[in-house]
């Protein structure tokens, strides 16, 4: 079987690669993935789009590639637009997702609803840079750029929370409730906006374990994806396309 390729925002250079030797997957639901669909639609394998459902807003279908390449957005740049400037124009609109979903060679999967994170305080002498892609809870909070905040991108999905200036692990029951809440939002969004559900799930931050997989299975998910499969034989690993570009 051909290996899976993991793609976020699309660069012009990707089209110089021999993409036909891969099965293409696209994370987050970015507009560039819709924009370049005319160049992708003849790909010999199915195209799989993993959308973060809370990022998809109502809106019309915009233009697609007709010879002009778009500027490439690094994840740090589009994260700033999303979570500091509260802009979502770099993600697909609902109309664009619906158009892609109707294509015969397209599969729609989910990448969680919130892509959630934890915000913590750090010591002034040990400040950590803002994570480039993990500010979902903190829209309209420009003060986090200058104050002593640390964005803990993976910890929410690892079962942690931050309360009373302390990073603590949720109880197993609390963590399960959190995962079920986020997943139900995904499933409901798919039903309400696309008229179908999906059995494809891509893990936020590549965080996965057997318990998480067992919970997701109760919602009907059967195929799981991450950048790395880890120890699980149930998870499809993927190659980051940027590792192939000089």
Model features per residue range: what roles?
Residues 1-26, 30-35, 42-43, 120-246:
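C-terminal active-site subregion of NodB/CE4 polysaccharide deacetylases
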Residues 2-122, 127-131:
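Active-site beta->alpha N-cap acidic-glycine motif
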